[in-house]
């Protein structure tokens, strides 16, 4: 204890001030991450059986993050009219999900496939150790679009089969 007090005195620190080496230990999030974590946009879910809803469920075994991102598509225009997410994970994963749902709304499905994890990471100023969170968001978008397209094929195939059996 004496050594610690002597070091603080030598450094000109009072007992209430942090030591300079403790400052480097603290990790802070960028204000965009904090904003999307404290005020996440589009939290929730749609009925996964709705033919106009695509669901992407992805996870990162390394850290335990799991992300479900859903899109609701206007079948006439092919435009994403709404999006929802549920994420179990760190603040960066939640923020990445929130940003992804904001960015996909109002866009055509083909356009959202161009959203890259690097853009999400840059927007949130994610450190390299958190890049996997933005990768999950990109993967969830792709998985949701794929799920929607597969549903449309099944729905259209079933409708076509119904038409041929009635003819």
Curated annotation (Swiss-Prot):
Keywords: 2Fe-2S, Cytoplasm, Iron, Iron-sulfur, Metal-binding, Mitochondrion, Transit peptide. Its main location: mitochondrion. The keyword NADP does not apply. One of its GO terms (cellular component) is mitochondrial matrix. Component of the core Fe-S cluster (ISC) assembly machinery. Interacts with HSCB. GO terms for molecular function: 2 iron, 2 sulfur cluster binding; iron ion binding; structural molecule activity. It comes from the Eukaryota. This is Iron-sulfur cluster assembly protein 1. Belongs to the NifU family. Pathway: Cofactor biosynthesis; iron-sulfur cluster biosynthesis. Gene3D superfamilies: 3.90.1010.10. Binds 1 [2Fe-2S] cluster per subunit. Residues 1-50 form a transit peptide. It is found in: Mitochondrion matrix; Cytoplasm, Cytosol. Scaffold protein for the de novo synthesis of iron-sulfur (Fe-S) clusters within mitochondria, which is required for maturation of both mitochondrial and cytoplasmic [2Fe-2S] and [4Fe-4S] proteins. First, a [2Fe-2S] cluster is transiently assembled on the scaffold protein ISCU (ISU1, ISU2 or ISU3). In a second step, the cluster is released from ISCU, transferred to a glutaredoxin, followed by the formation of mitochondrial [2Fe-2S] proteins, the synthesis of [4Fe-4S] clusters and their target-specific insertion into the recipient apoproteins. Expressed in roots, stems, leaves, flowers, pollen and siliques. It comes from Arabidopsis thaliana. Its cofactor is [2Fe-2S] cluster. GO terms for biological process: iron-sulfur cluster assembly. InterPro entries: ISCU, NIF_FeS_clus_asmbl_NifU_N.
């Amino acid at each position: 204890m004496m050594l610690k007090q002597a070091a603080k005195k030598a450094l000109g620190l009072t007992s209430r001030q942090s030591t300079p080496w403790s400052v480097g230990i603290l990790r802070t999030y960028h204000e965009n991450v904090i904003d999307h974590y404290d005020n996440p946009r589009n939290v929730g879910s749609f009925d996964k059986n709705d033919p106009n809803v695509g669901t992407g469920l992805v996870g990162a075994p390394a850290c335990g993050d799991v992300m479900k991102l859903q899109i609701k598509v206007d079948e006439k225009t092919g435009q994403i009219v709404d999006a929802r997410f549920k994420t179990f994970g760190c603040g960066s994963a939640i923020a990445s999900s929130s940003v992804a749902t904001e960015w996909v709304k109002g866009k055509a499905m083909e356009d959202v496939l161009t959203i890259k994890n690097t853009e999400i990471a840059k927007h949130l100023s994610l450190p390299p150790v958190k890049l996997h969170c933005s990768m999950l968001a990109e993967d969830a978008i792709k998985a949701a679009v794929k799920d929607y397209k597969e549903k449309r094929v099944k729905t259209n195939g079933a409708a076509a089969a119904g038409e041929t059996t009635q003819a």
